[in-house]
Amino acid sequence: MTNADDSVIDAPIDAPIDVWVDVLIIGGGIAGLWALARMQQAGYKTVLLESQALGAGQTRYAQGIIHGGTKYALTGKLTASSESLADMPTRWRTCYEGNGELDLTQAELLSDAHYLWSTTSLTSRISGFFASKVMRSRSSAMESASDKSSLPSIFQPKDFKGQFYRPIEPGFNVFRVIRALA
């Protein structure tokens, strides 16, 4: 018995297949999945290629912190790198709340910020001072005497004399973000 589909069944496996796409994305990490979703939203025929599993590369080792440029401002000046990241925390939070360019409502927010601290060494104090001035709108300095009780207990030793900073940079569960984007 034959049918019209026999030619497909009998086709050699190594036969070339023509595939026409507008955008080819290589890498199935968070950046690749984000780009895939945005390109598809814009109406592009898009294909994503991943040699292993989604999130198997660098994404697997990520801490999930959505940086807003704080770590790049530790030199005491705003750089192109720090400025290009300035809006990322807000952008991700908006997506997590269901009001952004992508739907990340199924992702898991682990923390709305994280902590940095400086010691009493001269270089640490200078770095902390300049970073706090440059990043004034993106982090809040926490005076160790007045705000110490609001810190996690590990950061409350009586003999600590440094300064705490709380960059407003959220942390997400990386694997839940991958699931939300996939």
Q: PLM features: residue spans?
A:
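Dinucleotide-binding Rossmann-like beta1-alpha1 core, especially the glycine-rich loop
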Residues: G64-L151
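Helix-loop-beta segment of a Rossmann-like dinucleotide-binding subdomain
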Residues: D147-A180
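N-terminal Rossmann-like dinucleotide/flavin-binding domain of flavoprotein oxidoreductases
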Residues: S81-S82, I178-A182
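Glycine-rich FAD pyrophosphate-binding loop
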Residues: Q40-Y61
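Beta1/beta-strand and adjacent pyrophosphate-binding region of the FAD-binding site
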Residues: A15-A31
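A short, basic/flexible loop-to-alpha-helix module at the beginning of a structural domain
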Residues: M1-W20
